[in-house]
Structures are given as C-alpha cells and as structure tokens.
C-alpha cells in the first residue's frame, strides 16, 4: 500500500515520531508543530493513500487497521525504523491506536488527538459529515485568498471543525483546502471506516493518551467519546476551549502532550 512521508530532523539518532493525519487532510497539517517536535524527535509526517503526495491504487484496503499495518510496514521495511512513537488526529488518531494493536513491539506510545472510532455503535452513513467542506474546498481552491476573507465561506468550511474558526491563519486554511480538494483517497478512506469502530486490543506496555477538546463539534462527547471503547489503560485528557483539530488551537500544548506520552514509555 503506497503511503509516503516527509521527514524532519535535527539528529537522526533522536527517537522516531510518526504523525498520522485524518480524512481529507495531509501530512502538512502538522507543520506548525515540527520546529518544536524536532527538538526531541525525528519526525515522519505520513501521507495516507490518495492524500498529499501518496498515490492511490485501485486495490487498496482502506479500513483503519489495514492502514495502520501499512504505515508500520512502511516505517520498518522502507525507512528502517524498528521502534516509534505515534500521534494522530481524528481518523488518524484511530489509525494510530490500531498501529499499537497490530505492532506493539514496534509502537512505544500513541497520542490519539480527538480520535475517531470511540463510539458505542456507528451505523453506516450515506455521506461523510465533512462532504460539504470537501465540495467547498474543490471550488474555493481556485480563489483561496478571496474565500478566506469572506466569513460566510470560511464558516462553511471550518465552523463544524472548530468554534475558533475565525482565528485560523490563511496558511492553515490554504493547506487544508488544497489537501481536501485534491485527496483522491477521501471517499475510499471514508468507506473503509464507515460503520466500524475501534475494537482492537492494545497491550498495556504501549503507553496511550487519548485527548479531546471540550468544544469538539466533529466528534462530540455524547456521541463519539466513549471511554469504555478505548483501551482501559489510556490516559484520558480533556483540553478546555479546544475543538477537533487540537494542533490548530494549541500547538505548543499538543507538542507537550506528545512528549509526555513518549516519556511514559522510556
């Protein structure tokens, strides 16, 4: 399965940190965190199949567990990395948890930032909840500076994701619009997760943190933050005045959460 990554490092001897983006996103969603993260890690920002620079094949298995196995295989076989810390956001957070389940000897810790998959039941849906944002992205990619300045358009694209949508920088919006508009893997990856939930077993030796914002409108507490579905040894953290894409709202705090989880494994 073709995944790709962008590597950032000051020292290749620093422990590996794998970053996994969500549906319709790309590895560059993490770039505001990279300058701080490379002080402690060699960072590998993954592009999932059909997202960012990664190609999409017709025979892809796009469910979260298969994607998790593909990332581990890529890191071990292609990049030569035997042990790694992992962080993921949204569907990427679910995939990160699955990585710990499929490869507990390779994955030392997981920081799951607003992970999908933690619900009692997820009946199949006909359309993904972010479909309107994808349609808008396909249109607005051609006039992004203008769209960014029009509050109504910016609200359509981001109000479901964050109550702090007015504060998003042009760079963050530009990168996310391009990633969403051009993600050939958007629908295949959504179909791979649709109707499923996280049900895997993660050994206690893999350190886990599950982090949600208290203003998450995409995966709200009453629907999609079921502690009993997460591994029982997870450290559960709620961030005040924070929405679904935690690294947009609080990049420095996100870095600290990742570092603290990694330290638990040392």
Labelled PLM ranges:
Residues 7-55:
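Conserved HGGG/HGGXW glycine-rich cap/lid loop of the alpha/beta-hydrolase fold
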Residues 101, 110-142:
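Flexible "cap/lid" loop of the alpha/beta hydrolase fold
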Residues 47, 85, 108-111:
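Residue in the alpha/beta-hydrolase core beta-strand immediately N-terminal to the catalytic nucleophile
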Residues 145-202:
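Conserved alpha/beta-hydrolase catalytic His-Asp/Glu region
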Residues 242-255:
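Catalytic histidine-centered segment of alpha/beta-hydrolase-like enzymes
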Residues 182-229:
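Conserved serine/cysteine hydrolase catalytic core
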Residues 88, 92, 96:
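Gly/Ala-rich beta-loop-alpha elbow adjacent to hydrolase catalytic centers
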Residues 66-84:
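Conserved acidic catalytic loop of the alpha/beta-hydrolase fold
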